[in-house]
């Protein structure tokens, strides 16, 4: 049985992204056919690849084959007309095929029939390319009148040729993701990656560096770093005091450098996360202040009473477009706190309870005497949401009921949040200065390592350039580039087969720089001077660099200033003398290793290592796994820094 085919003219402006439903054997009126056979879409739908449809089982092996393809009834995503009879919904798929080739251009606005809302089907999210075989077949069938559908068995259904760029029939059954679903999926993947990375941002501290931290830290200290990386707002000095890594599986000479690099990694990660969190806090408080709740509260504030004037002052500071100082916020919060204290009841939480409830979420937050525990727990949830990078409106008591007590509680909380954000932003600036100070200290420590191991010349020169850019530039990109450079230098130091004693070398430099005072209580004459003691310290064969051959004359010099007490301290002043270590002294520190002594020194070093591992206060424990290899050096802007280093070398700043 074959149904009678009708042809109708296409409405002007109708988009080409329409889906036609196969018709049943029953004939229907033309009006119902015009209304129910077309499902318009608000945006263009792109056809799916032939290979994707074949892999999904939605089309036969060849699109242009004689075997017809089929598709099920189109399921509307948001409409209400999905409960109609199948006989009313199924229409011929090739009935309007001649009009498709000569229709309006793709992407033209839809013009649904007056009084009828368009039925929208969500387009698939899979990109597509122009179809090769099906496109030509669609044009041929369209020119022949659109009656080329075949039936091979009772289970086969009618199909329409697919025009280039037109949605195929099988796309009606494909599952598609909306934009919000994709954003949620990406956010969840990012959260999982950060959680596996101990809370470190992958763009700040690479995952391979985090694996090294897991290897050198104790298990309880790994969890401690994870809690610190949650970036709970706190003072800068509190953060620097909490970062105290407990090392494991680290050589004694490498602990000082490893501890400083880990501390730097934790603080710079906190700095990065805190910047993003502060921006989200500002957005959340601005959204809340400009919301309908605060507007309704401002409309009912009475300036005739004392509490009304305190509320009006707080609203003025919250909605002001000019800059508000910390003193102004503190004055407003103090006046609101006085009004809340007068309205307190025996059931109201004490200030000690308020601080104990909120201290785990924000240490910088300024609290007040809230009148109810419901308000306290509500504001605790808001602080927790702010820690989770919430950018929407904050929940207030005035949403349910606007009264004087709720207004004072909400305004005290909002003013406290504004004051907290101001101090949090100031803490972020303090952390940046502290990071630069820390890099200066690490640079001096790395130079002491280089003086003992001159074979690290190129590595130290590269690190010095990175640190110089980090402490001299105002943008954070140069500051973030210092973290991989420090881990690269640590990787090179770990590969050295030598004892690293930075404080011992610094003591020798102090003795060499200040040789004018003989040792007290020694009558040995000039042979007991501090210079000779310093030379004896640095010429120990066990401190020699086993890889250094002729690099001593190419030692990079650095200005080192040694401080010592100059005279008898008084009750008002302690005189201190600063003496610099000359370049000649640095060039003559270590003697070269004679070839006949290298084998003997190697055996002595092995015996000393075994002794230190057996008698150290941090013995080497059983390794959980071999230490992960750190990646090779890959610095950003390397060409620019190399060019800058060559210019400095040519100008004489490097002593080669």
Swiss-Prot record:
Residues 1-174, 615-656 are annotated as: Disordered. Disulfide bonds: none annotated. Residues 59-70, 140-160 have a biased composition (Low complexity). The keyword Phosphoprotein applies. Phosphorylated. It is found in: Virion tegument; Host cytoplasm. Plays a role viral replication by forming a complex with UL26, thereby contributing to increase its stability. Mechanistically, prevents the proteasomal degradation of UL26 by inhibiting its ISGylation. Major target antigen for the anti-CMV antibody response. This is Phosphoprotein 85. It comes from Human cytomegalovirus (strain Merlin) (HHV-5).
């Amino acid at each position: 049985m074959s149904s009678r085919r009708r042809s109708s003219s296409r409405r002007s402006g109708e988009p080409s992204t329409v889906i036609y439903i196969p018709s049943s054997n029953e004939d229907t009126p033309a009006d119902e056919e015009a209304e129910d056979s077309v499902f318009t879409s608000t945006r263009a739908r792109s056809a799916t690849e032939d290979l994707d449809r074949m892999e999904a089982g939605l089309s036969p092996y060849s699109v242009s084959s004689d075997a017809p393809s089929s598709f099920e009834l189109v399921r509307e995503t948001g409409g209400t007309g999905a409960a109609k009879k199948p006989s009313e919904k199924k229409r011929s798929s090739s009935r309007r095929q001649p009009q498709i080739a000569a229709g309006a251009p793709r992407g033209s606005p839809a013009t649904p029939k007056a009084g009828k809302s368009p039925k929208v089907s969500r387009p698939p999210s899979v990109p597509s390319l122009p179809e090769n075989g099906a496109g030509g077949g669609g044009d041929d069938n369209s020119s022949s009148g659109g009656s080329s559908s075949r039936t091979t068995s009772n289970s086969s259904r009618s199909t329409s040729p697919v025009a280039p760029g037109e949605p195929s029939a099988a796309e009606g059954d494909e599952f598609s993701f909306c934009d919000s679903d994709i954003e949620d999926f990406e956010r969840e993947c990012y959260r999982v990656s950060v959680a596996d990375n101990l809370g470190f941002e992958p763009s700040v501290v690479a995952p391979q560096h985090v694996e090294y931290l897991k290897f050198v830290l104790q298990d309880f200290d790994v969890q401690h770093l994870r809690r610190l990386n949650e970036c709970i707002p706190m003072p800068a000095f509190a953060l620097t005091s909490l970062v105290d890594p407990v090392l494991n599986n680290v050589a004694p000479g490498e602990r000082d450098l490893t501890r400083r690099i880990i501390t730097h990694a934790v603080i710079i990660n906190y700095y990065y996360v805190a910047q993003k969190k502060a921006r989200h806090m500002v957005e959340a408080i601005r959204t809340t202040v400009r919301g309908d709740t605060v507007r309704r509260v401002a409309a009912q504030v009475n300036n005739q009473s004392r509490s009304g004037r305190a509320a009006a002052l707080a609203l003025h500071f919250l909605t002001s477009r000019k800059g508000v100082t910390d003193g102004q916020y503190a004055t407003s919060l103090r006046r609101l706190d006085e009004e809340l204290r007068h309205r307190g009841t025996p059931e109201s939480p004490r200030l000690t309870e308020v601080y104990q409830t909120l201290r785990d979420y924000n240490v910088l937050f300024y609290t007040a005497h809230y009148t109810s525990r419901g308000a306290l727990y509500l504001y605790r949830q808001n602080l927790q949401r702010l820690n989770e990078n919430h950018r929407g409106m904050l929940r207030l008591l005035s949403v349910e009921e606007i009264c004087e007590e709720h207004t004072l509680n909400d305004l005290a909380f909002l003013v406290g949040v504004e004051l907290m954000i101001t101090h949090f932003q100031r803490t972020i600036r303090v952390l940046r200065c502290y990071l630069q100070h820390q890099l200066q200290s690490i640079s001096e420590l790395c130079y002491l390592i280089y003086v003992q191991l001159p074979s690290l010349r190129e590595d130290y020169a590269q690190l010095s350039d990175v640190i110089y850019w980090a402490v001299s530039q105002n943008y954070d990109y140069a500051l973030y580039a210092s973290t991989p450079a420090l881990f690269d230098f640590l990787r090179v130091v770990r590969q050295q087969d030598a004892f690293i004693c930075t404080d011992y070398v610094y003591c020798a430099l102090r003795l060499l720089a200040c040789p004018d005072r003989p040792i007290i209580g020694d009558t040995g004459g000039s042979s007991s001077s501090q210079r000779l003691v310093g030379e004896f310290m640095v010429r120990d064969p066990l401190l020699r660099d086993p890889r250094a051959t002729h690099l001593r004359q190419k030692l990079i010099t650095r200005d080192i200033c040694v401080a010592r007490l100059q005279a008898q301290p008084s009750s008002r002043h302690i005189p201190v003398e600063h003496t610099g270590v000359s370049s000649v002294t640095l060039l003559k520190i270590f003697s070269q290793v004679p070839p006949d002594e290298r084998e003997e020194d190697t055996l002595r070093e092995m015996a000393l290592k075994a002794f230190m591992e057996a008698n150290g206060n941090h013995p080497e424990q059983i390794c959980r796994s071999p230490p992960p290899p750190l990646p090779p050096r890959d610095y950003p802007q390397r060409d620019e820094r190399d060019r800058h280093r060559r210019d400095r070398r040519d100008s004489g700043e490097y002593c080669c």
